[in-house]
């Protein structure tokens, strides 16, 4: 179960974004790079690249005009829309690929659908997207809902923080008990991260962000590759970082088509945008990219790190 955490509460940053991609480790992906004529910075899926080798499915990225987007699967209890065929990963790409787009033309479900007629046939999703220059951010989902998010920069204001996972999204006005446990933990931890790093330099903040992304509430024995243990998929609703877990008999993980034996947090992204929205730092840590990597790497010793800095 993926998770996205974001805040505008730090005095030195317009946005701090932390993202874990939970997936089958054997799923073929490309680490973060500039692509589409160096306009989009993101990792991307290798499973569904187009014939033109230009259109990629991606889960999180930003473009050179300050538009950013992160897609997460939406797990519905009744599995009512599991026959939808369009790739979720196209949504970030479609939004990020448009040059000189006015965010106000995209800022709700109906407007987005006007630009992309495949929205209703896309697999169930929660989609965060925005414009760091205009300082406007939204969440839409496959149920047709639109939420204003991150509308405040006050550290004590709930609207300064946002956490999205694979369950139904609830904004700051919703009943806390409705959210998954990992979302509640992440929300409290995100506020603490800001408070503890008010005077920290950027490297310390980056380190704190990855520490939060790596926070696990599961016993360490669960992820021991020598322990042949099938795990209840529901445990992934309770922990921010999901260690490599052997695939259970049923694949009810809110993920894509099963691929390989292990499922878990395979990639972590930290994105920082300066307060004046002119400087971006984007870091991806690839923890694992195959089942064999479980024995070679770990959350504290990732397989690969990609780091980018650029100006808007």
Swiss-Prot record:
Tell me the Pfam families matching this sequence: TANGO2
One GO BP: Golgi organization
Q: Name one GO cellular component term.
A: peroxisome
Q: Which InterPro entries match?
A: TANGO2
Give me the segments passing through the membrane. Answer: none
Query: PANTHER family in the record, alphabetically?
Result: SER/THR-RICH PROTEIN T10 IN DGCR REGION, TRANSPORT AND GOLGI ORGANIZATION PROTEIN 2 HOMOLOG
Task: List the protein's name.
Answer: Uncharacterized protein YGR127W
Organism listed in the record:
Saccharomyces cerevisiae (strain ATCC 204508 / S288c)
